């Protein structure tokens, strides 16, 4: 049986290696215009074909979709032919120059009327062939997939903005959809600050004037919810994204500010953790090197701080700080070195026991002298257990036992015989 492919769980399929993101977005937008919608098998075959097409010499930048269509093998599985055909139809509209004021009215001020041909849109705003644009709300699997992509990034960081910007280009959400996305991705405090910045940007945009905006039709947020108002929806999406970069700062202490070097952690590992945390936590456009140098010294352990202070490199370039701390040994290695026995030289003074030099008293082979005279003979040269009198008394008792009278053997035999006769 053939392999079955279900609908894609990730709403933003990964781009093939070597293909630019904006080119991959064009292919995705064309794929989502297919009726019925594309399946996971279609995306799999599209990625497989693009990986092979990138290696061919006819691959150009910008992409010539007509030449790319000739590279598709006959009876190629999937709907790659239809996707490339949609891109070929949209190529003239994308390459058309912007409209200019007519020659008979050179004083006509901007903005000039938009081009009649518009870019293809994706979910949740649907553009079926021959029917007006309709709206489809977010699905939970879409929100979960986007949140999984930004789970390790702080709001406003480059990774966060790249993922959210790609999702906005992919799904073309309305103002209500963007509000739901913000509530799902960020905390209530971040959402409140974002809402304040967004209201300020909307007020400035309404004052300056936006192409297609009619003040009599209601606020910009209401008009951007209309699926047919593509231009206003794009303007609102740009303002919504700009509100992240205008945030005054993190609502709580950033995670990278609490990263400290452990007492036994190498300095290079600590700096690597700091670098990864700053990449995921700094707002977009914030310089990273000054913050990294400052935290590399202020959050280091006491040993590394003393080493950097002694060399005068508390605010030096990061490479010099790493070289300065290369010779630092963690505490666990110092403990091992301290446990090893040290070879001490023999003393020059005489031993307290034998009076000879060359060894310590604890290593002396001469027995320890008695603490006082022997209680038996009052001789201070030996212990009681070694006293000669004690040994003499023991020997005398043995001699007394040997001097006891004993009967001869013939006398015992005579007694035994007489007793037996009786």
Curated annotation (Swiss-Prot):
A motif (PPXY motif) lies at residues 109-112. Residues 93-117 are annotated as: Disordered. SMART domains: ZnF_C2HC (SM00343). One of its GO terms (cellular component) is viral nucleocapsid. Keywords: Capsid protein, Host-virus interaction, Lipoprotein, Metal-binding, Myristate, Phosphoprotein, Repeat, Viral nucleoprotein, Virion, Zinc, Zinc-finger. The keyword Phosphoprotein applies. GO terms for biological process: viral translational frameshifting. A motif (PTAP/PSAP motif) lies at residues 98-101. Specific enzymatic cleavages by the viral protease yield mature proteins. The polyprotein is cleaved during and after budding, this process is termed maturation. GO terms for molecular function: nucleic acid binding; structural molecule activity; zinc ion binding. The keyword Lipoprotein applies. Gene3D superfamilies: 1.10.1200.30, Delta-retroviral matrix (1.10.185.10), Human Immunodeficiency Virus Type 1 Capsid Protein (1.10.375.10), Zinc finger, CCHC-type (4.10.60.10). A zinc finger (CCHC-type) spans 349-366, 372-389. A lipid is attached at residue 2 (N-myristoyl glycine). Pfam families: Gag_p19, Gag_p24, Gag_p24_C, zf-CCHC. Residues 98-113 have a biased composition (Pro residues). The record marks 123-124, 337-338 as: Cleavage. Interacts with human TSG101. This interaction is essential for budding and release of viral particles. Late-budding domains (L domains) are short sequence motifs essential for viral particle release. They can occur individually or in close proximity within structural proteins. They interacts with sorting cellular proteins of the multivesicular body (MVB) pathway. Most of these proteins are class E vacuolar protein sorting factors belonging to ESCRT-I, ESCRT-II or ESCRT-III complexes. Matrix protein p19 targets Gag, Gag-Pro and Gag-Pro-Pol polyproteins to the plasma membrane via a multipartite membrane binding signal, that includes its myristoylated N-terminus. Also mediates nuclear localization of the preintegration complex. This is Gag polyprotein. It comes from Human T-cell leukemia virus 3 (strain Pyl43) (HTLV-3).
């Amino acid at each position: 049986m053939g392999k079955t492919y279900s609908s894609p769980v990730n709403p933003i399929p990964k781009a093939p290696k070597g293909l630019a993101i904006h080119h991959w977005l064009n292919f995705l937008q064309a794929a989502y215009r297919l009726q019925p919608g594309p399946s996971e098998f279609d995306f799999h075959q599209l990625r497989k074909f693009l990986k092979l097409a990138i290696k061919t010499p006819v691959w150009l930048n910008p992409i010539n979709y007509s030449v790319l269509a000739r590279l598709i093998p006959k009876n190629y599985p999937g709907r790659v032919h239809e996707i490339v055909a949609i891109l070929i139809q949209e190529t003239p509209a994308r390459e058309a120059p912007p409209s200019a004021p007519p020659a008979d009215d050179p004083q006509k001020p901007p903005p000039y009327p938009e081009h009649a041909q518009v870019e293809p849109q994706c979910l949740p705003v649907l553009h079926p062939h021959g029917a007006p644009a309709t709206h489809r709300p977010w699905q939970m699997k879409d929100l979960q997939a986007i949140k999984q992509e930004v789970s390790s990034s702080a709001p406003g960081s480059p990774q966060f903005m790249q993922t959210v910007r790609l999702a906005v280009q992919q799904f073309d959400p309305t103002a209500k959809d963007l509000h739901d996305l913000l509530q799902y991705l960020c905390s209530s405090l971040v959402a409140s600050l974002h809402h304040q910045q967004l209201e300020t940007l909307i007020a400035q945009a309404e004052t300056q004037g936006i192409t297609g905006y009619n003040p009599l039709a209601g606020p910009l947020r209401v008009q951007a919810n209309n699926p047919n108002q593509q231009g206003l929806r794009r303007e609102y999406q740009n303002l919504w994204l700009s509100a992240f970069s205008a945030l005054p700062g993190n609502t709580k202490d950033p995670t990278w500010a609490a990263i400290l070097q452990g007492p036994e952690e190498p300095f290079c590992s600590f700096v690597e953790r700091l670098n990864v945390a700053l990449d995921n936590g700094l707002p977009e456009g914030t310089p990273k090197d000054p913050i990294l140098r400052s935290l590399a010294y202020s959050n280091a352990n006491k040993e590394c701080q003393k080493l950097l202070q002694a060399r005068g490199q508390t605010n030096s370039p990061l490479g010099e700080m790493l070289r300065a701390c290369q010779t630092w040994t963690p505490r666990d290695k110092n403990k091992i070195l301290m446990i090893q026995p040290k070879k001490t030289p023999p003393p020059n003074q005489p031993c307290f026991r034998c009076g000879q030099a060359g060894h310590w008293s604890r290593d002396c082979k001469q027995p320890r002298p008695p603490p006082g005279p022997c209680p038996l003979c009052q001789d201070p040269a030996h212990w009681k257990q070694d006293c000669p009198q004690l040994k003499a008394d023991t020997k005398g008792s043995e001699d007394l036992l040997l001097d006891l009278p004993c009967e001869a053997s013939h006398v015992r035999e005579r007694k035994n015989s007489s007793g037996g006769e009786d």
